[in-house]
Amino acid sequence: IPLRLVGSEMCIRDSIIKVGIGPGSICTTRMVAGIGVPQISAIKDVRKALKNKKIKIISDGGIKFSGDLAKALAAGADAIMMGSIFAGTDESPGKKFKIKGKIYKQYRGMGSIGAMYSGSANRYSQKKFKDKSKFVPEGVEGRVEYKGNVSKIIYQLQGGLRSSMGYIGAKNLDQIKKNAKFIKITKAGFYESMVHSVEMTQKTINFKSVSYTHL
C-alpha cells in the first residue's frame, strides 16, 4: 500500500470536507457543547450527501486501532486524520518526563486551556480572552507512554489495513468501499471481538486493552 501523507507544505487546491466533531481521545466538544455524531455514522451521512460529487472526505479522529482506519475508509472516507495514535512518538510535540520509571510525553487537545493559551483560541472564537479563566475549553491535557519512532506505528497501520483489504478481497483502497459491509453488533459481540478470558503477559504494539465498564 503506497503511503500518502498530507503535510503542512501542501498547497494544491482541491475540494475536500473534513468530517469529525468530538471523536478524538482528548476532545470534550460532545460533552461541553453537545455537538457531534459518532464518527462512522458521520462519514456515511456525508458521503451519502456528496453522492455523484467529486468532493473528497477526510475523516478526523476516532482511530484507536488499524481496524478503525479500514472502517473509516469503508464508510466513505478518502483520507484519515489521526492524533492520539501518534502521540508519545519522537516526532510528536510535547515534553518527555518520567514517572515511577516509565517515560511519558505530554499530549493536549487543540481545545485544551494550555493549547488555547498558546495560540489555538482563535479556532474556538475566544482569541479576545487573555485570562485563562475566561476560556471555555473543548479539550483536555494529559500524558501518554513514550512510543519511540513513529515509523513502527505507521508500519502496523499499513499492515492492519492490508490485512483488512485481504479479508474482503479489495485490491485497492477504492474497492474497500465497494466490498465492505457494515453490520450492527451487540455488547456481547463487541466483547467477543476483544481479547478476553486471559491476562495479557506481553504488550503488543498494535493492540491495547479497553475497559468494558462504560458499555
Where are the predicted features?
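Feature marks short, surface-exposed loop/turn motifs that line or immediately flank catalytic pockets
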Residues: 23-25, 88
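Conserved structured catalytic cores and adjacent interaction surfaces
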Residues: 8, 13, 26, 32-38, ...
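Single conserved hydrophobic/aromatic residue that forms the stacking wall/gate
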Residues: 1-12, 212-214
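Non-cysteine beta-strand/loop elements that form the S-adenosyl-L-methionine
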Residues: 16-23, 82-83
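Structural recognition of alpha->loop->beta junctions
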Residues: 13-16, 76-78
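Alpha/beta catalytic cores of nucleotide-metabolism and tRNA/nucleoside-modifying enzymes
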Residues: 34-59, 63-211
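Short, functionally important structural connectors and interaction interfaces within domains
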Residues: 2-3, 27, 78, 136
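Ser/Thr-centric signal marking residues that sit
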Residues: 28-29, 213
